[in-house]
């Protein structure tokens, strides 16, 4: 078999159904839209969430919660991500961005205790979880809140 002899499997390529092209096509006249009514018209159809005049679900349910405008969104760094640095390195938010551990600082850097730390490091960040602080100081490193 050669490349120019290859054909798609029977039934793999279905022909497009052209509607409104005469009664003999099987899809003439109303073009599969039925007779009259809103759905038969161009642009016909109900808007998203419309339930036929019944009070829609999104209006039946009460409003809930709010968006805190003072919310702080921290960039997360896990302990196992700190292993890429050399032993005894001072890690700052700038060095984390430079090495690609985090893409941007957001409201600050928070170090979490997921994974294992195998090096003695000095870590400067905006927040530390208790387990992260314990692990860093357990390896002889230091943590500094900035």
Curated annotation (Swiss-Prot):
Q: Keyword RNA-binding, does the record have it?
A: yes
**Classification via InterPro entries:** Ribosomal_uL15, Ribosomal_uL15/eL18, Ribosomal_uL15/eL18_sf, Ribosomal_uL15_bac-type, Ribosomal_uL15_CS
- Job of this protein: Binds to the 23S rRNA.
Q: Which GO terms describe its biological process?
A: translation
Q: Which PROSITE patterns match?
A: RIBOSOMAL_L15 (PS00475)
Report quaternary structure and partners: Part of the 50S ribosomal subunit.
Source organism per entry reads Macrococcus caseolyticus (strain JCSC5402) (Macrococcoides caseolyticum)
Quote the protein name from its UniProt record: Large ribosomal subunit protein uL15
Region annotated Disordered sits at 1-48
Please give the family membership noted in the entry: Belongs to the universal ribosomal protein uL15 family.
């Amino acid at each position: 078999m050669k490349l120019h002899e290859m054909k798609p499997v029977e039934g793999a390529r279905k022909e497009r159904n052209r509607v409104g092209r005469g009664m003999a096509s099987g899809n003439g006249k109303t073009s599969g839209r039925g007779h009259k009514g809103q759905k038969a018209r161009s642009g016909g159809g109900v808007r998203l969430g419309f339930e036929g005049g019944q009070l829609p679900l999104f209006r039946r349910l009460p409003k809930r919660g709010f968006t805190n405008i003072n919310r702080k969104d921290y960039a997360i760094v896990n302990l196992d991500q700190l292993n890429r640095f050399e032993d005894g390195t001072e890690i700052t938010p700038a060095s984390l961005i430079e090495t690609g551990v985090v893409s941007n600082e957001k409201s600050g850097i928070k170090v979490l205790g997921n994974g294992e730390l195998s090096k003695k490091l000095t870590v400067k960040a905006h927040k530390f979880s208790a387990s992260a602080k314990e692990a860093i100081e357990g390896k002889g490193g230091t943590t500094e809140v900035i």
